């Protein structure tokens, strides 16, 4: 059993990779990619994917018997009020109180979060007994405010949702890591396996990726690549990288070198 676990609220995860469920061609591929990733958590947009109506095709059916944790998210919500209502209804229908809080401020271009509405919703939901994983911008001050409001994990974007641009501000990932005590989960903008590895090397506790897997030419293969990248990045972070220096440093010893 791996002793280096990801702890969020009262739940413990062996995997530090979280996957999404959107943009796949069908539920079967979603399931197969998730299994290949060995992720133990999958996000589901409550407003866009049926998880509450048993009469319609249901993503939950594909994961029956698995230990994968469903993480309902509020994608599509733009205010604290509608988000709070959505999650309360979701909990009533499914019993799930482990949630990804996502409130979008710009719905047309950047899909950037509305951090003020997010902060308001976080405080209410946390007091209402939810375990809140809060999607936000890469601002260490807001990250700390969300933690103070009761968030059990902070999920700063690496780049705009679905952009595949990778981590645009590496320093802010480090600053957020230093500012909070709850897990930091890099979310949005991951485009390939190396992006996930870099996020972990910077100190992220986990990575969430959806589009990079779902829209890859081979989603199953990309899912396994993400799995390995997150593991490698975490090991690299724990091992401790060498310091960067402006000049060369010989890797072979010079003492006792033969002279000719």
Curated annotation (Swiss-Prot):
- The entry's protein name is Thiazole synthase
Alphabetized, the UniProt keywords read:
Cytoplasm, Schiff base, Thiamine biosynthesis, Transferase
One of the entry's Gene Ontology molecular-function terms is:
thiazole synthase activity
Listed InterPro entries: Aldolase_TIM, Thiazole_synthase_ThiG, ThiG
EC class of the enzyme, as a word: transferase
Q: Per UniProt, what is the name of the gene that codes for the protein in this document? A: thiG
Q: Which residues form the active site?
A: 100 (schiff-base intermediate with dxp)
Taking the first listed entry, what is the main subcellular location of this protein, grouped into a coarse class?
cytoplasm
Biological pathway: Cofactor biosynthesis; thiamine diphosphate biosynthesis
Which GO terms fall under biological process for this protein?
thiamine diphosphate biosynthetic process
Question: Looking at the keywords, is Transferase present?
Answer: yes
Similarity comment: family membership: Belongs to the ThiG family.
Source organism (scientific name): Wolinella succinogenes (strain ATCC 29543 / DSM 1740 / CCUG 13145 / JCM 31913 / LMG 7466 / NCTC 11488 / FDC 602W) (Vibrio succinogenes)
What function does this protein fulfil? Answer: Catalyzes the rearrangement of 1-deoxy-D-xylulose 5-phosphate (DXP) to produce the thiazole phosphate moiety of thiamine. Sulfur is provided by the thiocarboxylate moiety of the carrier protein ThiS. In vitro, sulfur can be provided by H(2)S.
**Which Pfam family, any one, appears in the UniProt record?**
ThiG
Q: What is its EC number?
A: 2.8.1.10
Which Gene Ontology cellular component annotation is one that this UniProt entry carries? cytoplasm
Q: Where in the cell is it found?
A: Cytoplasm
């Amino acid at each position: 059993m791996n002793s280096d676990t990801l702890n969020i609220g009262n739940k413990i995860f062996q995997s530090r990779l979280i996957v999404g469920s959107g943009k796949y061609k069908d539920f079967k591929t979603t399931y197969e990619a998730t299994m290949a990733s060995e992720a133990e958590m999958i996000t589901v947009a409550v407003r866009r994917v049926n998880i509450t109506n048993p009469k319609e095709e249901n993503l939950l059916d594909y994961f029956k018997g698995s230990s994968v944790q469903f993480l309902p998210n509020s994608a599509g919500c733009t205010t604290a009020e509608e988000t709070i209502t959505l999650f309360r209804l979701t909990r009533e229908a499914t019993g799930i109180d482990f949630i990804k809080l996502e409130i979008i401020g710009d719905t047309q271009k950047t899909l950037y979060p509305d951090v003020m509405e997010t902060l308001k919703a976080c405080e209410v939901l946390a007091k209402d007994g939810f375990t809140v994983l809060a999607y936000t911008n890469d601002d260490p001050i807001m990250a700390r405010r969300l933690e103070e409001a009761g968030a059990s994990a902070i999920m700063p974007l690496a780049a705009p949702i679905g952009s595949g641009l990778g981590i645009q501000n590496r320093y802010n990932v480090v600053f957020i890591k230093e500012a909070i005590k709850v897990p930091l989960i890099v979310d949005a903008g991951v485009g390939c396996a190396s992006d996930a590895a870099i996020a972990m090397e910077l100190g992220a506790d986990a990575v969430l990726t959806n589009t990079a897997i779902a829209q890859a030419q081979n989603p199953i293969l990309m899912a396994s690549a993400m799995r390995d990248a997150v593991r490698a990045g975490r090991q690299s972070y724990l091992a401790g990288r060498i310091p960067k220096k402006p000049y060369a440093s010989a890797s072979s010893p010079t003492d006792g070198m033969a002279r000719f």
